[in-house]
Amino acid sequence: MYTHLQGDFTLSTFAQVDMESDFDAAVLLVMVDDANWGKLCYEYSSQRPMIVSVVTRPGSLSDDCNSLAVPKTGIHLRITRFGPCFAFHYSHDGTWWELVRYFRMECDAPVKVGVVAQSPTGNGCQVIFQHLTYSPEPVTEIRSGK
């Protein structure tokens, strides 16, 4: 499920995943096109729930960054855009946010932004997204997430 957004924004949600197979995940995705996108995942990786981010750029392979292990009970995910820059944050409580990734992605046209459930090695997974929230305002303190 996605929408097109132009300009600055912040999109956040609380995600839960049943996590049975490797890489089962709840994902917040930002996409310019098939060769230019980024995703922030609450993912079952290395036999535990983790925060994972991936950025793909034209002419290169995707990178994959396992950030840290988190509780299996669910996590808050957030993408914010300001100009050509994007930041990925996670939070345990939806109040205090931790920076996962900060990167530049050129895009003059509107970008696709939305939620994805993925289970690339399994038979599917149940993902629940709660409180999907949009704001036209970006986060102003990227490092602290405020």
Give, region by region, the residue ranges found by the protein language model:
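Extracellular glycan-recognition regions
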Residues: 1-146
